[in-house]
């Protein structure tokens, strides 16, 4: 027993002398990774400069000094990572708040613009009166009634909103032309009232209207006056007939005298 104790003392003295010069690493038993604690597993994060990739490299336990330094470095790295994450989260929150503020301002501006536009429209339309399509087109013929007639007639499958307006304008132009001609014809006859006969005669006198309204019959329009020249008894024709009769009688007398 004494020998063993003496040996231990000697080894301790040798270790003390060696520690003063160069510290020796203690003998660490080999322990599998499964039995180790989480704190004992140390990882060093190495950032590659060329490629921004992080590599986790496990290190075996060699020196307690290195182990403590690694633990402190890991703690510092963890704290730095936590701080960075907190800063990133704060920045994201601030950015989201800014974006929400911008969205709110844009929505408020849009709503204000819509309200102002509605107010302007209401002011514009308040002064206007509800006008019909014929009034807006400066026409006397009713556009709505003409559209109804077109739809009831079923001349086409579809009827646009512009078709009755154009048709009303054309009909109005034709009626004005016919009325002007009939007024002139009535003034020539010293009449103060336009009759269907005047309208019929005005259409027959105009070549374009006559071509357009060939097959149209006007009620109580009558017939244009036309007497064949043979039926007319003129004084010239009467004298000519008398002369012809006298010549015939003289010829007959000459023929009878020659026979006798």
From Swiss-Prot:
List, alphabetically, the InterPro entries matched.
Histone-fold, Histone_H2A, Histone_H2A/H2B/H3, Histone_H2A_C
Q: Which domain of life is it from?
A: Eukaryota
**Ranges of Basic and acidic residues composition bias in the record:** 111-121, 248-260
Q: Which GO terms describe its cellular component?
A: nucleosome; nucleus
Which GO terms fall under biological process for this protein? heterochromatin formation
Q: What does the similarity note say?
A: Belongs to the histone H2A family.
Q: What is this protein called?
A: Histone H2A.v1
Organism of derivation: Dictyostelium discoideum (Social amoeba)
Q: What is the lineage of its organism?
A: Eukaryota, Amoebozoa, Evosea, Eumycetozoa, Dictyostelia
């Amino acid at each position: 027993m004494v020998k063993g104790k003496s040996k231990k003392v000697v080894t301790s003295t040798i270790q003390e002398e060696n520690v003063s010069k160069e510290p020796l690493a203690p003998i660490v038993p080999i322990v599998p990774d499964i039995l180790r604690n989480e704190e004992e597993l140390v990882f060093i994060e190495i950032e590659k400069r060329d490629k921004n990739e992080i590599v986790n490299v496990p290190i075996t336990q060699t020196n307690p000094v290195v182990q403590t330094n690694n633990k402190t470095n890991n703690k510092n790295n963890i704290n730095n990572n936590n701080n960075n994450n907190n800063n990133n989260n704060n920045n994201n929150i601030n950015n989201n708040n800014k974006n929400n503020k911008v969205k709110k301002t844009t929505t408020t501006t849009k709503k204000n613009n819509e309200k102002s536009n509605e107010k302007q429209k209401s002011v514009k339309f308040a002064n206007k009166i509800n006008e019909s399509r014929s009034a807006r087109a400066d026409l006397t013929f009713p556009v709505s009634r003409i559209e109804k007639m077109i739809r009831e007639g079923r001349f086409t499958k579809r009827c646009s909103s512009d078709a009755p307006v154009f048709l009303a304008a054309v009909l109005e132009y034709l009626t004005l032309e016919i009325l002007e001609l009939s007024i002139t014809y009535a003034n020539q006859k010293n009449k103060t009232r336009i009759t269907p006969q005047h309208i019929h005669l005005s259409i027959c006198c105009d070549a374009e209207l006559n071509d357009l309204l060939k097959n149209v019959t006007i009620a109580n329009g009558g017939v244009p006056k036309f007497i064949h020249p043979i039926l007319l008894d003129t004084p010239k024709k009467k004298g000519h007939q008398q002369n012809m009769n006298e010549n015939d009688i003289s010829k007959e007398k000459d023929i009878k005298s020659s026979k006798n």
